[in-house]
Amino acid sequence: MEKLDRLSEAFKMLLKQEKCSSQSEIVTALQALGFKNINQSKVSRMLSKFGAIRTRNTKMEMVYQLPTELSIPTTSSPLKNLVLDIDYNEVLIVVKTSPGAAQLIARLLDSMGKSEGILGTIAGDDAIFITPTHSTPMETLIKNITTLFESSF
């Protein structure tokens, strides 16, 4: 595993423990795990990159943590990890996504266009409404969309 990947995994593991209340504690813990060149500014950048926040743990201590419901999608996030649910009725498809991912995914769906059966999309923060064209059977469009999400890595 690449050194940056190991550092990222160790960093996430520390924050999941909900014990680090300061950046200096994170630096010390990472150094104890063998990351000797880590410093406070690097930890600060990592906290921003991973969307970490300070919040109270079960002992009412202020600690850094990575809330999964607030995770920020990136361009390297597989689509199948960002799509939570797909549902539809006779006239509309609704795709539920991770928070912040709907507009990215709607843009991709819009690029498929009318030839693939998509008349248009409306995206919020975590939901997309998809309107199919008249000429495309709903089941065919659902299958195409599901295949797109499952094949994207």
Swiss-Prot record:
Chief place of localization: cytoplasm
InterPro entries: Arg_repress, Arg_repress_C, Arg_repress_C_sf, Arg_repress_DNA-bd, WH-like_DNA-bd_sf, WH_DNA-bd_sf
Gene Ontology molecular function, alphabetical: arginine binding; DNA binding; DNA-binding transcription factor activity
Domain of life: Bacteria
One BP term from GO: L-arginine biosynthetic process
Family: Belongs to the ArgR family.
Summary of the function given for this chain in its UniProt record: Regulates arginine biosynthesis genes.
PANTHER family named in the record: ARGININE REPRESSOR
Protein name (record): Arginine repressor
Organism, as annotated: Haemophilus ducreyi (strain 35000HP / ATCC 700724)
Gene name, Swiss-Prot/TrEMBL: argR
